Amino acid sequence: MSVSAFNRRWAAVILEALTRHGVQHICIAPGSRSTPLTLAAAENRAFIHHTHFDERGLGHLALGLAKASRQPVAVIVTSGTATANLYPALIEAGLTGEKLILLTADRPPELIDCGANQAIRQPGMFASHPSQTISLPRPSQDIPARWLVSTIDQALGALHAGGVHINCPFAEPLYGDMDETGVEWQQQLGNWWQSDKPWLRQALQLESEKQRDWFFWRQKRGVVVAGRMSAAEGKKVAEWAQTLGWPLIGDVLSQTGQPLQCADLWLGNGKAVSELAQAQIVVQLGSSLTGKRILQWQATCEPDEYWLVDNLPGRLDPAQHRGRRLLASVERWLELHPAEKRQPWATVIPELSRQAWQAAVASNEPFGEAQLAQRIRRYLPEQGQLFVGNSLVVRLIDALAQLPAGYPVYSNRGASGIDGLIATAAGVQRASARPTLAIVGDLSALYDLNSLALLRQASAPLVLIVVNNNGGQIFSMLPTPQDERRQFYLMPQDVDFSHAAAMFGLAYHRPDDWQSLDEALAGAWRRAGATVIELAVNETDGTQTLQQLLAQVSRL
């Protein structure tokens, strides 16, 4: 009997089972203990293979692939800290709903807790963050193949959102020629190998039913809050709110077109808050709101009813409103709750929004990050998509820009970390094959510098704009101690990214005015690969511009 051959037969069943649950993309890091999984994946023609040498970046690449494809994505890594490096991406997926399947190779039980190399306690290492955890036994022909495949089916069939951790111990030898070992064991599955269906099929029904009193509430004064959703859902929400005559407060990730622009500015005006207080019902579609003023208003509003609709389970409401938590996709919920044509009831807010937008446009001439955010619509590629980093840049775009309705926008706004942003953007581009504009800050770029290697395989033009304000300038907007701010919060690095781009063979530009940025982007959209554009801006102008606009709009 060949141990290495049976390891591969066992792994082949696992990988084939994944294909029955819609897995097409599989991300693989180098490793020896993961050899059975890697070779089984390589031999399975149903997969699109992605490789990366850095497991943390690999996890975020998978996250981006899952975001854009809206399908589960598998990841294969070896044992030890390689597995631990998947933690940030797993956490993000759990909060934003992408489906990740983590196949972590492991040492067999007799090599754990005895000083063996690269052997750590992997079962349960991700605590409560995976939706499900499976600790498989060492491959054995004493275990029926139908047990293995049904175990995988049970986990994936019940997966609504988030990650599944499947820990896979393998004993040595890991290498060797294939022989007949395990062929009869695999044949226990009969014609399953020729089918395209899971061995064990489950019906997952979690959606809320139609609200029977909707016909009553849709005649009231309402407000629509739009959080994270798909581009198609964003367009439908905008039309739905317009038909109802309800003001729509659209987050940057809502893709609604933000008909009431600059909400994070005008929500700082007392007149707007007073008018919103007249609302009898607030319907929030999608979670993960970005703007500070939006979150402050959302936390203090007290309508008669507060409904929160999202496909993810859980409360998703840090303000803990009294109302209804409705588990459904936004698209399905809109189908069940049609709008009734009514005249708009809010009259003050549209005018405040118009004036806030005019103020933002009037401030967009200097070359800076706030101005880039306000102008961002003109830089979007046709038939493309936008990936927005975290920290200051996403807040500036949320507050100052108006994005086209239905234009795809992606970001990691679950845990809102600055790790893995370049890798996530790379995954989003690969899954969609669309031209992609990605914008991150300098510290975010440094944090994920390894992932510039992933941009070399861009299948369409990809532009990474690095806004270099020399540190974490978001902390300039917080009441951080003045004396300690620069050393302990901002942490300026005084770097430029020309050498990083050159190291990975990427085109690079460093424009210093709007005309040179226009020229750099025009050239980048004409070339097939990736381009890094570094915008070196004044350290504090971005935060100061936002604060000045907030003060100006609050006085309108």
Curated annotation (Swiss-Prot):
Cofactor: binding details: Binds 1 thiamine pyrophosphate per subunit.
Protein name from the UniProt record: 2-succinyl-5-enolpyruvyl-6-hydroxy-3-cyclohexene-1-carboxylate synthase
EC number: 2.2.1.9
Cofactors named for this entry: Mg(2+); Mn(2+); thiamine diphosphate
InterPro entries in alphabetical order: MenaQ_synth_MenD, MenD_middle, THDP-binding, Thiamin_PyroP_enz_TPP-bd_dom, TPP_enzyme_TPP-bd
First-tier enzyme category under EC: transferase
Function: Catalyzes the thiamine diphosphate-dependent decarboxylation of 2-oxoglutarate and the subsequent addition of the resulting succinic semialdehyde-thiamine pyrophosphate anion to isochorismate to yield 2-succinyl-5-enolpyruvyl-6-hydroxy-3-cyclohexene-1-carboxylate (SEPHCHC).
UniProt GO BP: menaquinone biosynthetic process
Record field: catalytic activity: isochorismate + 2-oxoglutarate + H(+) = 5-enolpyruvoyl-6-hydroxy-2-succinyl-cyclohex-3-ene-1-carboxylate + CO2
PANTHER family given in the database record: 2-SUCCINYL-5-ENOLPYRUVYL-6-HYDROXY-3-CYCLOHEXENE-1-CARBOXYLATE SYNTHASE, PROTEIN PHYLLO, CHLOROPLASTIC
Assembly behavior: Homodimer.
Keywords from the named record: Magnesium, Manganese, Menaquinone biosynthesis, Metal-binding, Thiamine pyrophosphate, Transferase
